[in-house]
């Protein structure tokens, strides 16, 4: 089974991706990881990607698609895979279609923007150890202080409310249209003979509750 997991930053995709991968015994396919591996290995595609990146440019969808096709030929992808961070745009989704890479199921983890802002902007971290807290969901024993050392906690720059709002804005502009694209495909309104299933999962509740909703949808 080939799966795409969609959702805004902070919706919990990373946590749920790990659960899905382990539960279904399929690998996570990360385009970023594949690019880095290809560059490190010095493959023809890796060298081509390195040349582009060294010039300060974004790697084209064509190169990414070629790397994905190579990855899907590996033995661990025989029973399927979970796409991590891809596609991000309609153009990339259409590239998958043109290359004949059929997707079986698209899962959207839906969380309201306000909830995501609260989740992410409430994070606090102890820089030295990496211990993380949340002012609402997992507060330290003493506000603003690490439980073990008593040292101050900090808010990472990418967790500020302003930054989170900007990331959500980019998501709604660039990635959210994929939700309409795949929901239309699932309803038979798109082009192409193969139509993936599409399921919207509410991303509120415990991690385990969300996991069970996703697995039930995938096995249904």
Curated annotation (Swiss-Prot):
Cell location: Cytoplasm
Keyword field contains ATP-binding: yes
Binding-site residues for AMP, renumbered to this chain: 31, 36, 57-59, 85-88, 92, 156, 167
Positions of region (NMP): 30-59
Stretches the record annotates as LID: 122-159
Catalytic activity: AMP + ATP = 2 ADP
Upper taxonomic lineage: Bacteria, Pseudomonadati, Chlorobiota, Chlorobiia, Chlorobiales
Chain's gene name: adk
Subunit structure: Monomer.
Protein name: Adenylate kinase
Pfam families associated with the record: ADK, ADK_lid
